[in-house]
Each structure stands twice: as C-alpha cells, then as structure tokens.
Amino acid sequence: MATAVAHYAAAAATDRGRKRPSNEDAFGLSVEHGVYVVCDGMGGAAAGEIASSLAVDEMMRLLTSRDGAHTLIDDAEEAVASANAGIYLRAQHSHNLSGMGTTLVTLLVEDGRGWMINVGDSRGYRMRNSRLEQITLDHSLVEEQVRMGRMDRLEAQRSPFKNVITRALGTQSSVTPDVFELENEPGDLFLLCSDGLTRELADPTIEWILKLDLPLPEMCARLVEAANDAGGHDNITCLLVRAEA
C-alpha cells in the first residue's frame, strides 16, 4: 500500500534583484490551511506592488477562512474572481493605478490531493523522483506561440515580446485561471515562482539546486542567489512546499 501524505512543510524567499528599484512581487503561505500563493505585479509607480499585495491578501483571506460549505477548488476559483475584481475596481477609481495587474500562481493541498491555479507567467513546478516538471502553462505571447509550433524556444528567448503576458489579474473585469489537479506523494517538492527566477535560471539549473535536498529555507536562498548571480534583472520570488509522510 502506498504511503500517504501526512503533512506539508514550506518556506519562501523574495528579493528585489539587482536592477529594479522596488519589489513588486508578493507571496503568502499557510501550512495550516494548505494555501500557498505567489504574485508578480505590474504597472507604473507603485501600482504593481499594490496589485500583487491585493491579490495575495484576498487569496489568503478567503482561503484561510473557509466554512466548508463548498469544495476547496470552488472556493479557490471564487477567491481568484474576488481578487481580480478588487484590483480592477481599485484601478478604475485611481488614475495613477490605471492598468495595474498581477500574475498569480497558487498551490492548494488537502491531504494527498493538490491543485495548482495560475494566471500569467508565474510558474508552478513539481519535483518528483529527482525530476522537475512544470505543471502550469505560461499565459505569455511567446509561450503560446511555442505551444502552437509557430516559434521555437530560441526564438522565444530572443523575441522582443517575451515579456508580454496574455492573462493577468485586474486588467479586465473578469479572468479565467487555469486549474491543474494533482495526486500528491510523500517526497513531492513543489516550487511556485515569479519570472524573475525562471528568466535567469533554466529548468535544469533549478532542478540541480533542488536536488541538493537542503532545508527548504536554504534552498530558497540558493535559488535567489543563483538568479541574482545570473543577472538579477527582475524581482525574484520562490516558494517551496514539500509533501511528507
């Protein structure tokens, strides 16, 4: 009989990077409630920072105060809609916040089950049996072109449109997130991150760091350090969650 997941452990780190004047990333986590969130804000002035913080705060508020009347994924989709509406309405009523938005990647766990939810190009990965796999699909112009076979990976990396995302929270009155259902096993290691990590580090490099099997806070620090060493062109956020027997 397969060993069941008994509990989870988590750690996170965020850093401004070496080029940006401020950090517009945000994250939230609650091991008790099985809720983990990373957001990467965008917009002029402090708008990106406001958008990402609003999204994280709303996701955490709603998903750590559930009454059990609905399924976890139903509550999560409602939380995404609420976060989107809050950012959108705030931007409509503040001229200096016009156009602000944020990406979102969320991991939800409940016993041995899990769900990843994403909007934008912040990613969710799973490491199982020493193999790293990207679970989410980037909502970005170049990644969608790659998936349709209209552009290869090298062309995507060189494209002037590589930073253009096709979905975000708060830029429209409604948004449709992608949802991925997971069956978790002891030893699974999940990574949620902003593109400040994945634009600097290729997946094999991330996999190599995670294979070091260090304490979670130390692995988060190693990931941030490696991204900064590679240039640190953007804010960097990583959140690790491990399923344990």
Regions found by a protein language model. Name each.
Residues 1-245:
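PP2C/PPM-type serine/threonine phosphatase catalytic domain
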